[in-house]
Curated annotation (Swiss-Prot):
Polar residues bias (residue ranges): 43-53
Record: residues binding Ca(2+) 2: 237, 239, 241, 243, 248
Domain EF-hand: 144-192, 198-223, 224-259, 260-300, 301-332
Protein name: Peflin
Lineage of the organism: Eukaryota, Fungi, Dikarya, Ascomycota, Saccharomycotina
GO annotation, cellular component aspect: cellular bud neck; cellular bud tip; cytoplasm; cytosol; nucleus; site of polarized growth
Pfam family, one: EF-hand_7
Gene3D superfamilies: EF-hand
UniProt-annotated binding residues for Ca(2+) 1: 170, 176, 181
CDD domains: EFh_PEF_Group_I
GO biological process: axial cellular bud site selection; bipolar cellular bud site selection; regulation of COPII vesicle coating
Composition-biased stretches (Basic and acidic residues): 23-37
Length: 335
């Protein structure tokens, strides 16, 4: 089945497949294609002749000796050798993909603090542009190749971390994680474990191969999605309370692409929020309930797109299909 990607004014640009298993297979295929493309680009760069040599100026040392020979002077000494200096142009660390790494070194772990990223960016910005065979790399090449390569390296790191977590918590050694094992793995910012309803929601979304569990490939997809949601959650926790309010929840949905009115965000928030702080005056969302709410919105959006045949944000549904859709969604109602 060919994947169909829709552009909506509301929703998270979710790619529709027959099953989550097909989605994961498509992700692996895209990763392999990107890897082959990067290898082909490297081969092409190595084989491309340097056209800048023909227009380069004569080195200072050669011109100096030539002038002295024409004037009848002997070369008793030579001036300081010419060494071209590159302009210090700030380079985004994501784009600095030409620097060679010693063979055999493992891929460094992903940085856990934004301060580390900023420090790295400042260090790279103070160095000259990267070189290929002692020639400056064109800026167009960096812009074209680097972002995809950076994403690929980050994707590989995510797969390594997720794989290690999977094996660490696969207590029974069955290459599958149960709801209890997944609950022991997933934690909120206050070190409390995810509630079982949030764990069940994730398993129902990603566990396509066998009901009630996730295999390694399914867990990797789950890990990547939860990681991206956590970044949005932390960014919108303005006061650092480890929970988010209804306004922060609405801003999170807007950032994820769910362009819905505040009233709709508020109703969704009320379905999952709890009175966490006894001294507080309103409900709050912890990260596990935030994830559960997003899983519910994903299901609603995906089902809506099924009946939005013109991709205009307007669904036309027959009465029979409406009943079937309602019964289907009823299996995943918040509890």
């Amino acid at each position: 089945m060919c994947a169909k990607k829709l552009k909506y004014a509301a929703g998270d640009d979710f790619v529709r497949y027959a099953t989550p298993k097909e989605a994961m297979e498509e992700t692996r295929r895209e990763f392999e294609k990107e890897k082959q493309r990067q290898q082909q680009i490297k081969v092409t760069q190595a084989q491309t002749p340097n056209t800048r040599v023909h227009s380069a100026p004569i080195p200072l040392q050669t011109q100096y000796n030539k002038n002295r020979a024409e004037n009848g002077h002997h070369s008793y000494g030579s001036p300081q050798s010419y060494s071209p200096r590159h302009t210090k142009t700030p380079v985004d660390p994501r784009y600095n993909v030409i620097a060679q790494k010693p063979a055999g070194r493992p891929i460094p772990p992903a940085p856990t603090h934004y301060n580390n990223l900023n420090t790295s960016a400042q260090r790279i910005a103070s160095s000259p542009p990267p070189l290929i065979h002692n020639q400056a790399v064109p800026a167009q090449l960096l812009k074209k190749v680097a972002p995809a390569s950076f994403d690929s390296r980050e994707d590989v790191r995510d797969m390594q971390v997720a794989t290690q977590l999977f094996h660490n918590h696969d207590v029974k050694g069955k290459n599958r994680l149960t709801a209890e094992e997944l609950q022991n793995l997933l934690q909120n910012d206050d070190n409390s474990h995810f509630c079982i309803s949030s764990v069940d929601a994730l398993i129902n979304l990603f566990g396509a191969s066998r009901f009630g569990t996730v295999n390694q490939a399914e867990f990797i997809a789950l890990y990547k999605r939860v990681k991206s949601w956590r970044k949005v959650y932390v960014d919108n926790d303005i006061n650092g309370s480890l929970t988010i309010s209804v306004s922060e929840f609405h801003n999170s949905l807007q950032e994820l692409g769910y362009l819905i009115p505040f009233e709709v965000s508020e109703k969704t928030f009320d379905q999952y929020a709890e009175f966490i702080n006894r001294n507080g005056t309103g409900k709050e969302l912890k990260f596990d309930k935030f994830v559960e709410a997003l899983v519910w919105l994903m299901r609603l959006t995906k089902l809506f797109r099924k009946f939005d045949t013109n991709q205009e944000g307007i669904a036309t549904i027959q009465y029979k299909d409406f009943i079937d859709a309602t019964l289907y969604l009823g299996r995943f109602l918040p509890h």
